[in-house]
Amino acid sequence: MWCSGFSVHCGLMSETIESQENQNEEAAVPAMTTVERAEMLLQQDAAIYAKINDGATLDEAVDPGNKEFGPLAHPEQVQMRVAKRAMMLKDGIQPYPVTLDVTATIEEVRAKYDGKLEAGDETEDVVGIAGRVLFLRNAGGLCFVQLSAGDGTKIQGMISKKEIGADSLKQFKQLVDLGDHLFIKGRVIASKTGELSVFAAEWAIAAKALQPLPALHKDLNEDTRTRKPYIGMIADEKIRNMVRNRSKAVASLRKTFADHDFLEVETPMLQTVHGGAAARPFTTHMNAFDLDLYLRIAPELFLKRCLVGGIDRVFEINRDFRNEGVDATHAPEFTMVEAYQAYGNYDTIGALVKQLVQDTAMDVFGSHKVTLLDGTEYDFGGEWKTISMYDSLSEALGEEIVPNGGPDNPGTSVGHLGEIADKLGVERDDVENHGKLVEHLWEHFYEDKLYEPTFVRDFPVETSPLVKGHRSKAGVVEKWDLYVRGFELATGYSELNDPVVQRERFVAQAKDALAGDEEACDIDEDFLEALGVGMPPAGGMGMGIDRLLIALTGATIRETITFPLVKPLN
C-alpha cells in the first residue's frame, strides 16, 4: 500500500537539508560563542512563534534565506517544524504531552493479528499505539502513515476524514512530519491490500521532531553514524541489533558468573595510583583535596583486595580508560570484565573464559557458530588451541629464544633480540627489555594470524608485573592471552600473591617509568600492605566487552560502542 514516491520525498528532503548546510558553510560565518548561538536560535524560535501568534501561515513564518538571523540560524526545514510547534501551542495542543493512552506495543499488535486477517477484514478490537513516523501518504480523504517501534517493528495507520472529521484530518496533514512520534487509537483492520492497520478514531503527536531525518533509503555515512548514533539507531537495523546484542552479551556474562558463585562488585574509577595494566593513564585533579588523580586503567588491584578480604570469587563489569591510540580494536574509553577466583590458577580461569565466551555466543545467537557481518561463519565450539610464546617464537625464528631467568640464567640477550628486531623491521620501544622485545617479535609473526580461538601461554616476567612466576620455567610467568580472529580478546593469570616479589616487580616498573616508559605502573604501597595481610592463590582474567562483540559480530570497536568518542568538528 506504500507508494515509492515516499522514498523520493525523503531523499529530496535530505538533499534540501544538505544544500542548506552547504550554503551556510559557503557563506561568511560570523564568530559566535556557543551561548551566543543558543540565544540566537531561541530568538529565532520566538520570532517564528510571534508570527504564528499574529496569524501568519506556516510558509509566512519561515525565513528561507535566513536573512534576519544569518547562516548559523535554523535551516528552512527546521524553521517549518518550529512553526508547526508554535501553531500547536497557539491552538492549545501540547507538542510534547506527558502521557497518552497507549494500550499495546506495535510488536504486540503484530504478534496477535499477523496472518489472522484477510484483505478488507475489520475487527472491533480497539488499540492505542505509538511510534515514529517513517512514511506518510496523502490520498485525499484518507492518509496512510507507517509507524515504527524502537525495535524496528512497523505497522500502518489509516487516518480517514470519515472517521475523524474534516478538521482533524486537515490538522493531521498540516502538523505531522516524518520523524514525529505519533499516537493513534482505533480498530485493528486489514486494508484492501491486506496490510495490517490501525484505523484511527483519534490521533495525537506524542513528540514533535524539529530536526528532519536523513534519507532512510540510503546508507548512513560513517561520520553521521559515529557523531549522531541516535540517527543510526533509527535508520539502520544493524545498529539497533548491536545495542541489543551487547545488552544480551553482558547479561549472559553475569549469568555465567552467577552460576559459578561469583559476586559482582564496583571499584573506584578515580585512583591515586595507576596500576593493574601496562597503559598510559588519563589524569585529572580533585579540587576538594587538591589531589591529582588517575582515571583507572584497570580494576585489578582493588578486586584483589576483595580476595584479601575474603570474597573468594569476584568480578566487575565497568569502564576503563587508557590514553593511547585509537584503531579498529582500541578505544580510549571501553568496557572490561575482570574476575578473580581464589584457589584457582591460569588453567582454571582459562576454562572459565572459554565457557563465558561460548555461553555468550549461545545466549546471543543461539549457537557456538556465529555469522559475522561480512557473511562468514566463525565457530567458537570444540576444543581451543594452545601454544607457548617462547616455543612458537623460537619456531618462527629458527633458533631457540631462552627466557631471562635472572643473573645466573640470563637467557637470550637484549642485544641479540634487538638485532633480530632491527633485521625484521620490528618497531622498538624507547625503554626496552628482554620481555618487551620478545613480545614485539612474537606479535610480528603471530598477532594477526591466529584466526581460530588460541591461548598463547607463558609470557616474559618483565612485561607481567602482577603475575605469579611459572612453576617450572625460570623467567616466565603463568599468563595467557586469548586470540580470536587475529586480535587479543582476553588475558588470564595465575595471580602473584607474594608481597616481597610484588614489591620487586613494582620497583622494576618504577625504574622503567623514571627512564621514560609512560606505560609502566606506579608502586602501590597500599596494595602491597593488603597483600601482606594474605591473599589466597588465585586465577584472574580480563576481557573487553567491546572486543567480545567484535569477535562475535565482525564489527569494529566503534560499531560495538553505542556512543563512541569522536573528535569535535570545531
Give the location of each predicted region.
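Class II aminoacyl-tRNA synthetase catalytic cores and aaRS-like
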Residues: H9-N570
